[in-house]
Amino acid sequence: LSRGLGDVYKRQTDVGDQLLLQVEPEPTDIKPILVLCHYDTVWNLDELPLHREKDRLYGPGVFDMKSGLVLTLWALRALLETGHSLPEPVWVFCNSDEETGSAASKDRILQLSREARAVLVAEPAEAVTGSLKATRKGNGHYHVHIKGKAAHAGNDPLGGISAVEEMAHQILHLHALADLPNGTSVNVGVARGGTRANIIADEADMDVDVRFLTEKEAVRIEQAFQSLAPVHPGITLTVTGGRSMPPMEDTSKNRSLLDVARQAALALDYPLQTCSAGGCSDGNLTSAAGIPTLDGLGATGEGLHARHEQLYVDEYPLRTALMASLLMRLRDFGC
């Protein structure tokens, strides 16, 4: 699909290839627009065979987000082949580990974004409305190990210190840290402890997912975990983990880029909407680094990360046109 568009550079990692397409039709001093894509998927073809039913295409990555990659390439090709020379260089970066947190590609993404004027993320649009994702929550993952003292539950009920009982108190405490009206959630998703019903448990463990819309909330949650204290004497708490992704906040730079997208949509008579997403993308990284970032520019569909993942085929040309229309209007952005 990229044939004839520009030079493709490949970097091999343990989790697959990182691909960089540089579309630079004419020499220029203008900084590029960076489009972020990923080609790893949640499901494989054995689990989710590729097939079409009327205007729906089903298969791994048809929504998240190989469709966004294909859409981007066709938008570039359409501009070049219809005589609309690109008003700026465009770099398209594709990584292979986004679904697992982009650990192998994070540094490369940040390096490229610092050379760019703006970042467009071709992740899928919001499932129902097709909204662009103007903000995204950041996330963190924590593990809490609780050490108590074992004893026979019948013969020596006062001799033990229950790690499971302590865990129950800590779950309530951690969930109370949530501030849902302000976008902060705390979820103890895994809780395990003890070995037998007749033994007072000496160990318990919790895995906790946290989400936040602002850096301020991220700091508050982080400090709460760092200061976590036992309820019962004799209990030891060990907390590991921390923040994984920064939030993609509502910044003036991001709003300026969104304004250009609104103009691009208006030219197509396309009713553009925006939303806030609870999941993370590589756009979280670039936005937190201070680079104007806009997300959700990929395809419309539904079933994100589900076995019914699907692409709305009939809306695909319009989403491609939106990407092309936006690229055409970014010549003076950030200059």
Write out the residue ranges for each language-model feature.
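Single conserved hydrophobic/aromatic residue that forms the stacking wall/gate
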Residues: 1-9
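Metal-dependent amide/peptide-bond hydrolase catalytic core
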Residues: 12, 124-129, 134, 140-335
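Short beta-strand segments
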Residues: 36-37, 93-95, 120-123, 145-147, ...
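Acidic-glycine-rich active-site phosphate/pyrophosphate-binding loop
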Residues: 40-53, 120, 135-145, 263
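Acidic/histidine-rich catalytic neighborhood of metal-dependent amide-processing enzymes
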Residues: 65-66, 70-135, 179, 331, ...
